[in-house]
Design a protein with these regions (language model features):
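Short, Lys/Arg-enriched segments at the junction into DNA-binding effector domains
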Residues: 2-3, 118-141
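N-terminal/domain-start alpha-helical segments
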Residues: 1-123
Length: 141
């Protein structure tokens, strides 16, 4: 199964993301802090994609990204954050993220971006974004 880690400290946003990714066929592991995310990745080495918020208590998403990249160059990383300044985007990509999505976001777009990372990671099966886009065509604020 396609396993994803979602790091988001706000429970309502995390729940929204998790519900939509599970509907799309993903096995989702949740974390609400940077430290917890790193622990979950160590316990689940088969995670192929990580969605990381930036603004977190303790270790921020940029540092989580750096630490992941120090030990795992193959995992796909998407920064998923409200920070939309160009410098934040550049920093995210320079620390090792493969993509950067700002809130509000479309769940259909997020699923398509996750699918793209799975395709690049080795041709694994992706979610049926065409079938679910009508259901997921809502924007989250």
């Amino acid at each position: 199964m396609k396993k994803i880690l979602v790091l988001e400290d706000e429970a309502s946003i995390r729940s929204f993301i998790v519900i939509n990714l599970r509907r799309a066929g993903y096995d989702v592991i949740e974390a609400e802090s940077g430290e917890e995310a790193l622990e979950r990745l160590r316990a689940n080495p088969d995670v192929k994609v990580a969605l990381l918020d930036i603004m977190l208590p303790g270790i921020d998403g940029f540092e989580v990204c750096r630490r992941i990249r120090a030990t795992n160059t193959k995992i796909g990383i998407i920064m998923l954050t409200a920070r939309s300044q160009e410098m934040d985007k550049v920093t995210g990509l320079m620390t090792g993220a493969d993509d950067y999505v700002t809130k509000p976001f479309s769940p259909a777009e997020l699923t398509a971006r996750v699918d793209a990372l799975f395709r690049r990671a080795g041709g694994e099966e992706t979610a049926q974004t065409g079938e679910i886009s009508a259901v997921l065509a809502v924007y989250f604020f």
